[in-house]
Curated annotation (Swiss-Prot):
A single MF term (Gene Ontology): protein kinase B binding
Positions of modified residues (Phosphothreonine): T382
Naturally occurring in which organism (per UniProt): Homo sapiens
Major localisation: cytoplasm
Region spans: Interaction with AP2B1: 363-409
Effect noted on mutating K11A: Abolishes interaction with CHUK
GO biological process: adult walking behavior; cell chemotaxis; desensitization of G protein-coupled receptor signaling pathway; excitatory postsynaptic potential; G protein-coupled dopamine receptor signaling pathway; G protein-coupled receptor internalization; negative regulation of canonical NF-kappaB signal transduction; negative regulation of interleukin-1 beta production
InterPro entries (UniProt xref): Arrestin, Arrestin-like_C, Arrestin-like_N, Arrestin_C-like, Arrestin_CS, Arrestin_N, Ig_E-set
Region (Interaction with TRAF6) residue spans: 240-409
Gene name of the encoded protein: ARRB2
Name under which the protein is recorded: Beta-arrestin-2
Effect of T382 to A/D: Reduces interaction with CHUK
Cell compartments where the protein resides: Cytoplasm; Nucleus; Cell membrane; Membrane, Clathrin-coated pit
PROSITE patterns found in the cross-reference section: ARRESTINS (PS00295)
Amino acid sequence: MGEKPGTRVFKKSSPNCKLTVYLGKRDFVDHLDKVDPVDGVVLVDPDYLKDRKVFVTLTCAFRYGREDLDVLGLSFRKDLFIATYQAFPPVPNPPRPPTRLQDRLLRKLGQHAHPFFFTIPQNLPCSVTLQPGPEDTGKACGVDFEIRAFCAKSLEEKSHKRNSVRLVIRKVQFAPEKPGPQPSAETTRHFLMSDRSLHLEASLDKELYYHGEPLNVNVHVTNNSTKTVKKIKVSVRQYADICLFSTAQYKCPVAQLEQDDQVSPSSTFCKVYTITPLLSDNREKRGLALDGKLKHEDTNLASSTIVKEGANKEVLGILVSYRVKVKLVVSRGGDVSVELPFVLMHPKPHDHIPLPRPQSAAPETDVPVDTNLIEFDTNYATDDDIVFEDFARLRLKGMKDDDYDDQLC
């Protein structure tokens, strides 16, 4: 009988190993009515701290331009949210009681460990990365959340990468428990100089799909016209609403299917088409919205964004949606089409069950995982199941970490 798995805690140290941040998770779920709180612990070397303070910041930023173009003080980045927490010495206000995880970490790490706590506002966007082009370098565009811990006499004092800890977390959403109604759409096209029509009806078998799941598109055509339907095209399109200084919408096909199914005049046609949107088929498309990712980890197409009813429509960031388009290619022009909106997301994981591996992830033989698990002895029986794991990433062969501040001790 195997041992009970321990509580996994992520840790990351500054390059000089004087400061270490501990977090219970890297993904924080937006439940629409609330967002998981960010609770962690920072451990500092007292000889290094001296008379300085320990600060922790949480930043949500939208990078909308290449990092190598940040010149002359002009940055293609907008901070959507910044919060600061003074972990040590504690502020005079009544301290917030530590969470259960923080309490266990404080007992295990000792007197030089200090808790910090953040509440993520509900109106902030989820983590989304825009897929870079083959020649793009530096940080990818998109929305990300970053925690930074450092020692300084004041917030205005400039901190250096060597003595600070920076780690990226994600704000995510999971599929709702109750999906919406089955999507369906229909249209009738009347042609010039004719009273006979072409009717198209399409539907999906459900509204909610998980990443990697095929979509079944039911197409029904009633052709009472004198024209012939030469082809039927089915495509899945991703729509990304970029809300920053102004709102712009970008669409990108992520799956396409074309069949030479003909529908003659005065006849009917019915068929179910199966199509699957996958990131693996869209690796070269620059600007495609992907789920926010930690560096050198694989990911998937961006999940649909769910906005709470009555929420502020002017939320800054990237709002993602999907539609299936069914198009009839008609002889002598006059094509007919309909669109079916649907939701593409990850299922809500059960407690203590990790998020399923992305469908587009590389084989395990190609992506060695450096978890560097460390388990410490303790006198507290309730703390025996804590397992510390470096805030590591999946290393891809042939790639190296070019950010000095991402090196782990």
